[in-house]
Amino acid sequence: MRLDDPVSLACRLMSYPSVTPDRSGAIPFLAELLSDLGFRCEILSFGNGDVEVKNLYAQYGNGHPNLCFAGHTDVVPPGGTWRTDPFSPQVKDGMLYGRGASDMKAAICAYISAVARLDSVPGCLSFLITGDEEGRWREYGTKSVLDWMTKNGICPDYCVLGEPSSRKRLGDCISIGRRGSLNFELSCRGVQGHVAYPELAHNPIDDVLCILRKIKDTTLDSGTDHFPPSHCEITSIDVGNDVENLIPSSATAAFNIRFNDLHTAESLYRDMDAICASVTSNYTLSHRCFGGASISQPSCYTATLCEVVKEVTGLDARLITDGGTSDACIISSFCPVAELGLPSGTAHKVDECVSVADVLTLAEIYHRFINRFFAVAQSRS
């Protein structure tokens, strides 16, 4: 297999049915590829007894500067009805179809092919690949690998995360930060009764709706220099009541807040709890955070990445902080990170696909950036 052909590599990697958490063999496959390129590979398994997540740390060279590429092999379930087998990748009319094409197996392969074309590495190259970024066991993925790296004295100088950061065209956006994501579950208790005798009951739906309206009417902030305003979206309202003449005894709701660096998960929980308490005392509110707001301040390496994108695509990449959560929020507390990958338009969708030309172009961007990174690092030393 030609390691400098990103499309062929992507077809192989995408053929692994690596629905999160990835147990498909994709991680050992990547370890084999990188071993052939001279990387020292460590397959790292973390878990809690009920689940085990396989991860990969691979390194070429030693010391600094260390340029790391991060990514994930796990994918969301295919869902729906595909025109092609989601795990039998096909190239048709210049498009590569299959689950993981956009998010983010093709980007991993583009970076590997970029590395395969290097004449020399005047420093250290590394890969951090996890088998669970999409699912519920993320604590055993990138976070656990970073803990392992810290214990072993490994700290990259810069990281490129291959998430699908591009919007309409490859290279139009580079993500330097991510908003935090906080999920809430609200439950209000009432008094069950007959709809004809509301004075003998208390309808918890009224309390839930009042709380949600107050939350939606609350302006959390006006945004910052790098982040848009924080906002809340209601995702569920439920009573589990199939009886038309019954006032239910309880009602639940769920909502999500995407928040910027003016807040923490705990400060937002206190704010939401105060709103609930202003309406009723008969409630419970729980929360689960999928990462706080994070940002890597633009640096000479970020500028270099933008320069390379401009050279290859002709586009002036926008530095953004919107979009969904990613492992960048974990990596950014460890080392500076920028996300640059393929367009996100079909990520997680039926018939997920990317342009073959974009895969080849992304490989060229990665290749030039790797060379330029070491040149910039040497000029600063």
From Swiss-Prot:
Binding, Zn(2+) 1: H72, D103, E163
GO molecular function (one): cobalt ion binding
Coiled-coil region list: none
Domain of life where this protein originates: Bacteria
GO terms (BP aspect): diaminopimelate biosynthetic process; L-arginine biosynthetic process; lysine biosynthetic process via diaminopimelate
Catalytic site: D74, E133
PROSITE patterns: ARGE_DAPE_CPG2_2
Cofactor binding note of this UniProt entry: Binds 2 Zn(2+) or Co(2+) ions per subunit.
Pathway(s) where this gene product acts: Amino-acid biosynthesis; L-lysine biosynthesis via DAP pathway; LL-2,6-diaminopimelate from (S)-tetrahydrodipicolinate (succinylase route): step 3/3
Reactions this protein catalyses: N-succinyl-(2S,6S)-2,6-diaminopimelate + H2O = (2S,6S)-2,6-diaminopimelate + succinate
Keywords: Amino-acid biosynthesis, Cobalt, Diaminopimelate biosynthesis, Hydrolase, Lysine biosynthesis, Metal-binding, Zinc
Pfam families the UniProt entry points to: M20_dimer, Peptidase_M20
Cofactor(s) the protein requires to work: Zn(2+); Co(2+)
Similarity annotation: Belongs to the peptidase M20A family. DapE subfamily.
Function: Catalyzes the hydrolysis of N-succinyl-L,L-diaminopimelic acid (SDAP), forming succinate and LL-2,6-diaminopimelate (DAP), an intermediate involved in the bacterial biosynthesis of lysine and meso-diaminopimelic acid, an essential component of bacterial cell walls.
Known partners and oligomeric status: Homodimer.
HAMAP family xref list: DapE
PANTHER family: ACETYLORNITHINE DEACETYLASE, N-ACETYL-L-CITRULLINE DEACETYLASE
Protein's name according to its UniProt entry: Succinyl-diaminopimelate desuccinylase
Origin species: Anaplasma marginale (strain Florida)
Upper taxonomic lineage: Bacteria, Pseudomonadati, Pseudomonadota, Alphaproteobacteria, Rickettsiales
